[in-house]
Amino acid sequence: MLAQERDSLPGVSLGLVYENQPQPALAIQPFTGRFGGADLVDDVEVIVGRDLRNSDRFEVMDSIPAGLVGDVVDYTLWDRLGAVWLITGQVEGAGEGYILILELHDVVYGQSVERGRFRIPDGTDPDFRMAVHRASDEIVTWATGDPGMAASRIVFTMTDNQGNKDLYVIDSDGEN
């Protein structure tokens, strides 16, 4: 539930305009962590979930409590809940950083279709969020064949009361 609460923080919202098509339901099974990765699981899951919602390519389903899912993907359960795609994730400690393991499952056919391992730095590293955004973009590519936009940055200027202009760079989700 902490991940859902943090995902609802106000921020920048981006919209895309393209041909209206039905969006497949995508579920995110609660991520797990091991070998020290448990400390980052909530942050990573929140970023991935927000990125997939902002991609506007899926109808991202609300998460279900971790206690209702096991270590093995229950395709029947996810199918009953209406999911077409399912993302599973695990964060593992690896030396100086972490490995994020993401897997895309086709719930309709009951099989894993893509799996990737992504190196991510510690959560205090300035590149942490961008590394997770790049992993999220891979999920979009796996499911749609089109690149994701989460690893994009937005640059803008603001003028203060004295007429000075400041340049700002933020992630596509409004952070940083």
Feature map (PLM): residue ranges:
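Residue position within the beta-strands of beta-propeller blades
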Residues: 88, 153-158, 169
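Short beta-strand->alpha-helix linker/helix-N-cap micro-motif
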Residues: 7-77, 91
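Amphipathic beta-strand/beta-sheet edge segments enriched in Tyr/Trp
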Residues: 71-138
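Boundary at the C-terminal end of the N-terminal hydrophobic targeting segment
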Residues: 3-5
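Structural signature of eukaryotic scaffold interfaces centered on beta-propeller domains
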Residues: 133-151
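Structural motif
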Residues: 95-99, 162-169
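Multi-bladed beta-propeller domains
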Residues: 170-176
